[in-house]
């Protein structure tokens, strides 16, 4: 079974703020990971509820607003053992296919992923699948009721209802 060997290029820790379906968003953070970053670098990301300003509105994920991770030092993570879920799963990710079944994605901007895919025996070791499953669960919650799911747009600093996104 082939295993990913990080090449410490730092590409995964830069260009973290991207356009996604018409909104500008940063690296996803689980609520318990917010403390890993300075408060001014974290904003809400996903919320569930009728309206963001209402009492029962629940923020289910946050996002890093910095384009580069502040923990990247000499192309290495200075907080590797406690890095966020999004970082743990990288360069792999899980998404949902047409039948709502998990589909494995691989970020081919990662040189280690390219090397792994080019030299694989057909089986990949996905050691942090549990982390990818946690992020996939957020997607499932959003897709269960897209009219009650909201995404915080970093460009406008406003909430956008998920079903209204591009």
List PLM regions with ranges:
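Short loop/turn segments that flank or connect secondary-structure elements
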Residues: 1-166
């Amino acid at each position: 079974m082939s295993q990913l060997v990080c090449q410490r290029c730092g590409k995964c820790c830069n260009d973290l703020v991207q356009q996604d379906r018409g909104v500008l968003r940063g690296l996803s953070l689980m609520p318990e990971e917010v403390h890993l970053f300075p408060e001014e670098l974290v904003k809400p990301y996903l919320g569930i509820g009728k309206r963001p300003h209402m009492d029962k509105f629940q923020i289910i994920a946050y996002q890093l607003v910095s384009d580069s991770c502040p923990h990247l030092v000499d192309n290495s993570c200075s907080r590797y053992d406690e890095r966020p879920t999004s970082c743990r799963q990288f360069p792999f990710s899980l998404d949902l296919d047409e039948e709502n079944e998990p589909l494995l994605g691989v970020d081919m901007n990662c040189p280690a992923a390219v090397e792994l895919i080019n030299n694989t025996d057909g089986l990949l070791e996905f050691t942090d699948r549990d982390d990818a499953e946690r992020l996939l669960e957020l997607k499932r919650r959003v897709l269960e009721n897209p009219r009650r799911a909201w995404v915080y747009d970093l460009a406008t600093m406003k909430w956008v209802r998920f079903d209204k996104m591009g």
